[in-house]
Amino acid sequence: MMGALQQQSNGHGHGVLLLAEAGYAEVDPTGRYGRFNEILGKGSSKIVYRGFDEWRGVEVAWNQVRLRDVVRGGGELERFYGEVHLLAALRHRGIVRLHAYWVDAPRRALNFVTELFVSGTLRQYRERHRRVSAAAVRRWCAQILDGLAYLHAHSPPIIHRDLKCDNIFVNGNQGEVKIGDLGLAAFRRGGGHARCVGTPEFMAPEVYDESYDELADVYSFGMCVLEMVTLDYPYSECSNPIQIYKRVISGIKPAALYRVSDPVVRQFIERCLAPAARRPAARELLDDPFLLPLEDDGFFSGDGGDGHGGFGVGYYNLMYNYLHQPACIDDHHACSNGGLSPSNSVGDNDVDAAVQRGDDDGDNWLRDIHMLFDEDDDDAAAADANERVGGVDITIKGRRTDDGGVYLGLRIADKNGTGRGRIICFRFDTEADTAMTVAAEMVAELDITDHEVTRIAQLIDGKVAALVPGWRPGPATDDDDDDDLVGGGDDPDAPGGAAAACCKNCRPAASSSSSCGSLVDFMSSAAAAERHGCRRCAELHGRFEEITFQADDDEEEQHLQGSSSDTGGSNHEQHAMGKDKEVMNINGIAQDGTVQGSEQP
């Protein structure tokens, strides 16, 4: 396929018409890239237009830099062009990809085409999303530093010279940030002498003296972190560049820095803003305590940058999972699982953080049940019910909270078959549940072998009876569960029959004083509802949290997985990464510090 410019120069005189039909205002010398008049961004010396790559069929960013302020003559133009040629060879996950570049000498402009980021710049993204966790800011910082370290590792080092949040670009759907706007980047010259270029608020003191190296980028990065944390532009208290210049060369830090009350965050920023002789390199900053995973993360919302505000990441993940239950099909189903458990499995570190903050027992039950299976007390183990069926060990443990709640955990280990095991944790309602309904619900939603249902129910009965004195087990199993169905039973044409509304939670509003059946009603009727074809509630609700592990004889290596009974039992297990390193995936974030990408829907 020929590009627009290639068609223009084919000698048939139709070039102008073809260019107009494509809607381009300009094309590159090869005819591959076309520029539209739509402006995506504008800086002091650069304008970014929306462009199109005809060969790949994707939109790109067409950057146009005016060289009249940075190019003095033909010799410097050639030298600058050579540097840009080397920049085109940069390939790093933290650097915006440069696809093509060329100098338009008659117009004294440098054009370069880069990948397009639909989420815009980090400054725009942060303004749109004013409340983000400290963990998110740390991940952004780590990616930016990684990109800077890559630039500075070249020989000679590449200095960005204009690093700021406006020149850092975001892929919001993947949580990735990349350093862009390399139009002013330069190689460090011998003796450290260079031109004074950049944005005054982000320029290091030595830049004003025109004697700087790659550490000037680290200073600019520190100002970026300050803006990320406080949502304030550095030196916003100043009204003109002269005031900024006087403060910078006098060593006066931005006023926003003194509103950062978190000592770790503030110390990290101050390290970046230190005098050049004491300023660490980008690679060194990657080991700073601020970038290490913490058990308790706060939030940065521009309210002083304290990074706390009363909520930690454990609480946040618990509440996020609790609130983001799958929506019901009908309006009268606008209810979640009532807080019996989060919708996604919560990692140990999340729940540990909740324990350290002193949350109530209702938030800690998953961790407590999990810990019961780690106990080595022989007497305690002997007191728990155990069963071995066809090479499968089944153990049940539980506890009763001060408010009377009963929480159980069922450990199923197949030592003769796949060698895999699972711990299923759930809450048992002694006033509404029976062991058989819960066991049937578990089998239906978690794909447990049918022949184990009766034995599972017996184990549940025995454990609940041990935890709740005077509690009487319910009936083993019969058709009584069908009484939970509304109307004409199996007759789909009967009023209120299965076809119309086969369980209490799905019945029409007219059949009840409440438009949504109680959660207890649903929990006790879900299994029966599924047998009668009502898959809406059975698939969209659930109480079970599941932990998988490798069932070894003497040792278990457990791996949390982000699934619950809400997913209909579709589990994706994480395999062992070795005894010395175990990676958990919580809310799409690998806990070893890496960020996992996700496919767009």
From Swiss-Prot:
A GO molecular-function descriptor: protein serine kinase activity
The active-site annotation reads D181
The alphabetized UniProt keywords are: ATP-binding, Kinase, Nucleotide-binding, Serine/threonine-protein kinase, Transferase
Q: Which GO terms describe its cellular component?
A: cytoplasm
Stored PANTHER family:
SERINE/THREONINE-PROTEIN KINASE WNK WITH NO LYSINE -RELATED (PTHR13902)
Q: Belongs to which family?
A: Belongs to the protein kinase superfamily. Ser/Thr protein kinase family. WNK subfamily.
- What protein name applies here? Probable serine/threonine-protein kinase WNK3
What organism, scientifically named, is this protein from?
Answer: Oryza sativa subsp. japonica
